[in-house]
Amino acid sequence: MQSWNSQSFLSSHFTMLRYACKRAVPRLNAASGLRFQSSKPADGPETVFTSLNEENDPNRDAFFKYTWGTWLKNNEAERAKRETRFSIEGLAEVIKSLPQSGKAPIEAETEIKVTQLASLHEGKHHRVYRVDVDDGKQYVLRIPYGLGSELFRKKRIQSEVATMDFVREKVANNKFIVPEVYSWNATVDNPLDTQYTLMDYFAGRDTLMKHWNPVAQEMTERAAKIKPVVDIYSALLQPEFTRYGSLYFTEDVSSKDASVLAYKGAENDKKELADRWRIGPTTESRFWKNSLPEDSPLRGPWETAEEYIEATAAINLHNLAELAKNGDRNPAVVAAATATYEKYQQLASQLLLRPEVENDNLFSARMGFGDLHPINVLVEGQKDIAESSLALVDFENTSIKPALLIGTPDYVRYGGLKLFKTEDIPNYDQLSDQEKAQVNYMIAQTQNAFTFEFLLNNEAPEFINSFSPRVKRLSEPVRLALNPLYLEDHLDLSEEMIKLQQDWTPIMGMEREFPVHWTNEEYEKQAKDFAEWNQKAMSTPFFQTKGWVPQDMFEQLFGNGLLDKTESGDYVYVPPKKE
């Protein structure tokens, strides 16, 4: 049994929360027979009408504005980046050009009308609309926010559409369905005047998220919601690819990359399928936070798992070199982060060695669905989940990577103290209500992660060793290197490497020397900086969301006087007065 005290519990619990990847719940603006609607966040829900025939109608602006949350700093600028303005007339033009149920496009003299647009979801990178047409057809329109470079958005859309096509043709079968893409454009040179994807709308379905309660009392209830995700996860693992990067249509990769078939067994497949897809540069965001040219080898594709792992260090060092050159970040923090990633570069090539993992299949190139989460799994609204067919949406964060680095989906990932029952905690009944709630939360998270792995072992036992404690420990530095939220998060990576060094022989059973070393001064500085960074994180409201507050929560906090607006237009947290 693990030792227990309140302080170590809170520390472990907080570290887990900071490492966890947050996923937000969508806001659904129900269409209630209105032709055009949106929500006005400051004053509560307000229906906004506009004429679909008047491009310059001022009321139309409200429909494109971001409403899902507020930033405590630079709110107006952050919202402006997420406006999704497009030409509604251009949308009608695109829909008119589509083949109708296998028939030719609509004749030029035939008028097609978009009768209603409804905002379904304002996500992290996209706004999602439902488009109703007067012939009864409904579509989903995805418009990316203007975040990152236009080139990065272009590659993401190209890869997302190709990946959806591949999964629909080669993976889904009768296990789940994938929206068909009817039209898309990865540039702004099109009738909508923006990058977009137009695809199937699945009527009568809910997100699995509506049924998911991560702390539901009955584990069987949670397991029933985890199993659909496991079924999809295991299906996506089945195709083996020839390289590491991201999927594209053949015409969207370089001639060099077009010469290599995308997946194992393609030479025996139908020619039109074998020639359809190729592996090109990865679309993982860490590789695009720079000004590298489109064909930079630092973004892949890579021939081996080892090359990919080494690239996770090389790209971070390149990004930091650009930051140092630009001079717009704290030089001391950039220098400290560079020192951390230089040590990580020494470690990366020595972390996961094939003879020590003892399962070469875990190094094979497989599909990782970065946003595999109940919010992106749709179930039939009128059926029990166990009997419902599944639909998978939102493929933007999908890449081809070593199987052992795909890992647990973020919504059930847990890196804190493992607790399975309250009996594991001495004197549980004597804890405060707050500590009991935290213990219960950790028990639920432990059970969720265990349940995912247990169910996956039933579906895809050949990959279960990716989740062994040893492989997970060795993979963790790679995960941290690819997913920092702040520049200072290099301290988390450094802390993880130091802990791994300490456990290298006694816990991990390694016979070879740990590849990286620290001086006593470096140990002391890391301990001091890490403690200060944790303290800042613990004392900063909405730290994990970088100051973003869900709109309903913002309105409640502001209305209750817990947030105050400054002269600069920013918001500050006002702690409640002690009675």
UniProtKB/Swiss-Prot annotation:
The keyword Transit peptide applies. Its main location: mitochondrion. It is found in: Mitochondrion. The keyword tRNA processing does not apply. Residues 1-36 form a transit peptide. InterPro entries: Kinase-like_dom_sf, Mito_inheritance_9. GO terms for cellular component: mitochondrion. Keywords: Mitochondrion, Transit peptide. Belongs to the AIM9 family. This is Altered inheritance of mitochondria protein 9, mitochondrial. It comes from Yarrowia lipolytica (strain CLIB 122 / E 150) (Yeast).
